[in-house]
Amino acid sequence: MGILIFSMIGVAEIAFAVFSIITKSNQQKLRNISRIAAFTGFVVFAILPIIDWSSRYYALAVLLLLLAIIGAIALIRKKEEKKAYKSARVVLKAIGMTVLIFTLTLPAIIFPQHKAMEMTGEYKVATITRTYTDTKRVETYTDTGENRKLNVQLWYPEKADKRYPLIVFSHGGFGTKSSNESLYNELASQGYVVCSIDHTYQCLYTKGEDGRTTRIDMGYMQDVSAENALADRQKSYEYYQKWMKIRTGDIDFVIDHILSEAEKNNVDTAYKLVDTSKIGVMGHSLGGSAALGIGRMRKDVSGVIALESPFMCDIEGVKDGEFVFKEDIYPVPVLNVYSDSSWSNLDQWPQYAENYDLLSGTNATAFNVHMSGAGHFTLTDLALASPLLTRIFNGKKSTTGTEYCLKTINKICLEFFDSYLKGKGEFTADGMY
């Protein structure tokens, strides 16, 4: 829609410029009428609604409103043209307005309108957002001495009357708690309570119940961008230790907090629905690495899903220039989902050595799925929200459809958790999709 709006207004600007040059007139009256018509058309599009009214259109709407007001005032006053016609001025004005319109439609171009994916479960889904304070940990990204605070969001079956398994999700390196919302909704509609965490200072931004917004720590962002296991194993190991300590601490605390709330009276409905004996964890990228770590840390976790994530928590050190991994068999059922971004590199990227080993026969209960034609960020809802950014971050265009990819992931994740958290059937998904 953003491209369509820009094209319509851009073509109109060029047409006015050409017409003005042909008639050797500024055509100010006609231009004023067109400004009013443009704003009126925009409002009609929003009401119908052809335009999904949201923040992506705010700046453009303000500009069109201002131009319409100026045009209306000029028409009412019947203001005559005072500036003499000059073709150069007409051309520069058209170029300037086109550039301005393009700039203001960029949010709609980068984040185009899209329909939310339909849920297939029997339950309608409700959601709440909460802020948790971990009184046992001090925030390490600031020097205020404050305890670490985490903003979380829970999705759960609405109007349900029994208890359901708990699934906790950890976002990727620069992600947010909404990174895989289509997956959370699907799981909740099928009878799960899903909690996604904003890892404060490790997420792009997060907003607490008090309205305070906290943005990503620039030092952390630089570290993630600089990390290169092929070039410096020791430095990467130090990064992994630091990141995983924070991430696993967050997940561990959130699980404990939810389990504690589930045992209380007079708490939010979401907590009352939690079956404290059935817990799964999952995550994307860095978040998946933390989820894999939690699978070893907690005895009450029954299944782990990692969306393209190395076993960072299993790296015990560096010896002779190579990572040293735990030798113990991974203790819980695990589903690893890969895209083209890593699939052909699993045997080459040192941090993925344990992942590569799990592709062959092992004693661990491990499943491996390759989403062929997809990239790293196609495994998240960013692929729906911004195909352009997804293509840029992936480094190439995905050759598989976004909805097909996400629906397949949702289906496989549901089947995995149904099997290992609800005891429904045998999970067999494996291989390429």
Predicted segments with their positions:
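Short beta-strand element of the alpha/beta-hydrolase
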Residues: K162-G172, L183-E186, V194
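C-terminal catalytic-base region of ester-bond hydrolases, centering on the histidine
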Residues: Y58-L60, K86-V90, A116, Y356-Y433
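The feature captures the conserved acid-bearing segment of alpha/beta-hydrolase catalytic domains
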Residues: S302-H376
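Internal/C-terminal transmembrane anchor helices
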Residues: Y85-P112
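N-terminal cap/lid segment of alpha/beta-hydrolase-fold proteins
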Residues: F39-G41, F45, A108-R163
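Membrane-embedded alpha-helical segments of integral membrane proteins
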Residues: K29-R77
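Alpha/beta-hydrolase active-site loop
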Residues: G208-T276
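Primarily recognizes the serine-hydrolase "nucleophile elbow" in alpha/beta-hydrolase
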Residues: V254-E322, D328-I329
